[in-house]
């Protein structure tokens, strides 16, 4: 309760050869929306913003379709599931600057400023978008939320190494036998990840 709070998704994937976020946005945008809705409910936020690369027009189109479907079913908008919880999401096309992958630079860009990192503290969780509490995570993090709730935190933790829990999606590219996306348990070596891909 209290001040307006925001959920922000950093979908401005800018690393050369990276397309993990793009595959989720184009292939399963509902998983991202579901994670943001759950996070919004938990944090008491009423608005979500997806900051997406402008160079991903198909991803933006698929997100818009998924958001329209969610609104039609009552998963976005006012009084979700009769709980009194209001939550909606909008998309903001990124400005194309690599630095906007840094959370405070992304927030500056959302506010219409030049996407430059800001000094921390304050951290976005306390003073983020428009100086209000902001939860900012990437596509993969939000997309994992519903799976973790459905299967349990321990099931996610069991997929990783002792000190690095869960799994991670990587884009394999370059001088390797077979490129593409691979999801592997945390702690797995790059060599073993490539072997699993072949």
Give residue ranges: language-model regions.
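Conserved oxyanion/phosphate-binding beta-strand-loop segments in alpha/beta enzyme cores
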Residues: 1-8
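Hydrophobic alpha-helical positions that pack around
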Residues: 3, 60-186
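Short connector loops/turns at beta-strand edges and beta->alpha or beta->beta junctions
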Residues: 10-16, 41-45, 175
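N-terminal catalytic cores of NTP/NDP-binding nucleotidyl/phosphoryl-transfer enzymes
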Residues: 11-13, 17-30
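Histidine-anchored nucleotide/phosphate-binding helix
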Residues: 29-42
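Short internal beta-strands
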Residues: 47-54
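Short, structural beta-strand-to-alpha-helix junction motif
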Residues: 188-193
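Conserved small/polar residues in nucleotide/adenosyl-binding loops
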Residues: 195-198
